[in-house]
């Protein structure tokens, strides 16, 4: 029986290996992680991550040919194919801090592989890494191998999953990308991994390239997607200034077959573990290769995203008589997108910090985010979310300004304003009349995801702001915001 081991039981490693186990019942798949609580979660009825459809896949395979373990060394030693799906966060200090990828976890994984391997291995980069990482990993493996004349083949097999649809993306991917060395051994390794995916992925969707093309393709894909979001968000600011409707503009340009409609929804900004991190990594790589114009081009995608978040906060404050001090603001949604509990780099963090910084009292509701997670996120510094550190509790002054509710109506009770920051479907179905009746007047609603009908809410009595939509008379009369 072929044995696959995956180092890293997070948002990528867990779902990916579960689907491989489901589609390849004759392959033994073991997911390993040094975090005992995380592995306990994968072995329990309540998985450590929320992803639609994941529970069912794990339930079918776990204990049959899918296993989760903290015994990293044993399972790495036994496997013929080792996926590495560890975090590659942005560096917080030292050379490249604030841009470069921190490969500490990747290097640690490579050293474990070298230390315990007693047979040839195919090592698969599943994490997003800088171009030429495979070359560095080859050197680490070659100089640290304890098992004699062991041969390693490094492959790049980046993930292209979207949280909230990860299982669907794995079942029916747009493409599977496999990059390897252009040698007989490298081509054989590519063929071996391709044979795994070929169990359920059509041949024309499995793309093979050289290593460097595969590594760069992942960074480029995320940069292009984030670029579309920042582009439509930039247009949303112009729409508000001119009276145009960003939804109509996006629909119009999306009908152009050369552009297409996806990733053209204006919002308070993009978040998640990948977009910002990968673009900053791309910026750093461009700078290292002496391409400052290219670096500046991609850095502007991040700058527009930051601008969109600060613009939203400024709109809230300026609309409410230029002060939110002591006013309750209900925040609906804290995850970076619907159908996930992931809060990494969520725009809600910056919005909530901005409101609290102006002395607002913030009441947060999200159906998949715990109070512990909210408080943890709001005390973190930028780029800290994937770095181990001793977290300090929220300061007493900040804590009294932040509360977490498990009900949208309770969050809005007694509030002066509601901010919608995640596009959860349930927010489209709320009884906004009931919510309005329990709020201070004038009652404001700031829709950062364009999930509600602004005209309907205005008829109820709300003062409504929707990203990129024509401003109502109240907002037009308020001072302009940057």
UniProtKB/Swiss-Prot annotation:
InterPro entries: 6-PGluconate_DH-like_C_sf (IPR008927), NAD(P)-bd_dom_sf (IPR036291), UDP-Glc/GDP-Man (IPR017476), UDP-Glc/GDP-Man_DH_C (IPR014027), UDP-Glc/GDP-Man_DH_C_sf (IPR036220), UDP-Glc/GDP-Man_DH_dimer (IPR014026), UDP-Glc/GDP-Man_DH_N (IPR001732), UDPglc_DH_euk (IPR028356). NAD(+) binds at residues 8-13, 33, 38, 86-90, 127-128, 163, 274-277, 344. Substrate binds at residues 159-163, 218-225, 258-271, 336-337, 449. GO terms for biological process: glycosaminoglycan biosynthetic process; UDP-glucuronate biosynthetic process. It catalyses: UDP-alpha-D-glucose + 2 NAD(+) + H2O = UDP-alpha-D-glucuronate + 2 NADH + 3 H(+). The modification Phosphoserine is found at residue 395. The active site is at residue 274. One of its GO terms (molecular function) is NAD binding. The keyword Lipid biosynthesis does not apply. Pathway: Nucleotide-sugar biosynthesis; UDP-alpha-D-glucuronate biosynthesis; UDP-alpha-D-glucuronate from UDP-alpha-D-glucose: step 1/1. Keywords: NAD, Oxidoreductase, Phosphoprotein. GO terms for cellular component: nucleus. It holds the Pfam family UDPG_MGDP_dh_N. It comes from the Eukaryota. Its EC number is 1.1.1.22. Involved in the biosynthesis of UDP-glucuronic acid (UDP-GlcA), providing nucleotide sugars for cell-wall polymers. Belongs to the UDP-glucose/GDP-mannose dehydrogenase family. This is UDP-glucose 6-dehydrogenase 2. It comes from Oryza sativa subsp. japonica.
């Amino acid at each position: 029986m072929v044995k696959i081991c995956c180092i890293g039981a997070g948002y990528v490693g867990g779902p990916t290996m579960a689907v491989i186990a489901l589609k390849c019942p004759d392959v033994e798949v073991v997911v390993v992680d040094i975090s005992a609580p995380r592995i306990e979660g994968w072995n329990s009825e309540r998985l450590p991550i929320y992803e639609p459809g994941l529970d069912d896949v794990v339930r079918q395979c776990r204990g049959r040919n899918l296993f989760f373990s903290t015994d990293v060394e044993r399972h790495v030693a036994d496997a013929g194919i080792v996926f590495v799906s560890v975090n590659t966060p942005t560096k917080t200090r030292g050379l490249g801090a604030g841009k470069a990828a921190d490969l500490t976890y990747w290097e640690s994984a490579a050293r474990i592989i070298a230390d315990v391997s007693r047979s040839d291995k195919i090592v698969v980069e599943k994490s997003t890494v800088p171009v030429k990482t495979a070359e560095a990993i080859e050197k680490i493996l070659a100089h640290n191998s304890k098992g004699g004349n062991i041969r390693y083949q490094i492959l790049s097999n980046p993930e292209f999953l979207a949280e909230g649809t990860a299982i669907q993306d794995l079942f029916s991917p747009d493409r599977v990308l496999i990059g390897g060395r252009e040698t007989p051994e490298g081509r054989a390794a590519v063929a071996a991994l391709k044979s795994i995916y070929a169990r359920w992925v059509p041949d024309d969707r499995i793309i093979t390239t050289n290593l460097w093309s595969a590594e760069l393709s992942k960074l480029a894909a995320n940069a292009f997607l984030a670029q579309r979001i920042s582009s439509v968000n930039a247009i949303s600011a112009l729409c508000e200034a001119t009276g145009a409707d960003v939804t109509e503009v996006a629909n119009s340009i999306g009908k152009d077959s050369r552009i297409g409609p996806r990733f053209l929804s204006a919002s308070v900004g993009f978040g998640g573990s990948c977009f910002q991190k990968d673009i900053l990594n791309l910026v750093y790589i461009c700078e290292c290769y002496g391409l400052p114009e290219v670096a500046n081009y991609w850095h502007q995608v991040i700058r527009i995203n930051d601008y969109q978040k600060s613009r939203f906060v400024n709109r809230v404050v300026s609309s409410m008589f230029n002060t939110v001090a002591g006013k309750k603001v209900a925040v609906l949604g804290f995850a970076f997108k619907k159908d996930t509990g992931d809060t990494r780099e969520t725009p809600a963090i910056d919005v909530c910090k901005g409101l609290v910084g102006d002395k607002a009292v913030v009441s947060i509701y999200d159906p998949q985010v715990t109070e512990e997670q909210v408080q943890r996120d709001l005390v973190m510094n930028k780029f800290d979310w994937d770095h181990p550190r001793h977290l300090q509790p929220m300061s007493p002054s900040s804590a009294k300004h932040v509360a977490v509710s498990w009900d949208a109506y309770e969050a809005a009770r007694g509030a002066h304003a509601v901010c919608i920051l995640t596009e959860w479907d349930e927010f489209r179905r709320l009884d906004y009349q009931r919510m309005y009746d329990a709020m201070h007047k004038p009652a404001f609603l700031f829709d950062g995801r364009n999930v509600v009908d602004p005209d309907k809410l205005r008829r109820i009595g709300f003062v409504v702001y929707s990203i990129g939509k024509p401003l109502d008379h109240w907002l037009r009369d308020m001072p302009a915001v940057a």
